[in-house]
Amino acid sequence: MRRAVVFAVSAVALAACAGQSSSSPRPNPSLITRDEVVEAGISDAFQLVQKLRPAWLQKRGSTSFTQEGDVRVYLDGTHVGDREALRGIMTIDIESIEYLDAGRATFRFGAGNEQGAILVMTRK
């Protein structure tokens, strides 16, 4: 009888500890996919990023007195401005948006990316 109780309690404990399967995986914190763009139902990239990944728009680390710095925006690999440039990019054209931290952005695009970079890839 005692073994049956221990077995039952163990079975319940295992079931409680088991991971729950979810219908959708957690989103990648550095990427906004086309599916997320469509699901959000937002018209411009700035509002989309503000809703789905607001941390991308926040300033990080120290800046100098002469150059405050801002995240840089690249559209299909071409620098188009700072985060305000996202307001002019319509989500209907977006395939994905990726955030690069300062180190990765500087490695890929060079100096001037101390606040990171937002890469917008359009649908072809």
How would you name each of these model-derived features?
Residues 27, 52, 66-70, 92-95, ...:
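Extracytoplasmic
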Residues 11-32:
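Bacterial Sec signal peptide processing site at the extreme N-terminus
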Residues 1-7:
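Bacterial N-terminal signal peptides that target proteins for export
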Residues 36-64:
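Post-signal-peptide N-terminal segment of Sec-exported extracytoplasmic proteins
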Residues 42-50, 83, 91-94, 117:
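Extracytoplasmic/secreted envelope proteins and their assembly/folding machinery
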Residues 94-124:
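A beta-strand signature from Gram-negative outer-membrane beta-barrel systems
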Residues 65-103:
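Periplasmic plug
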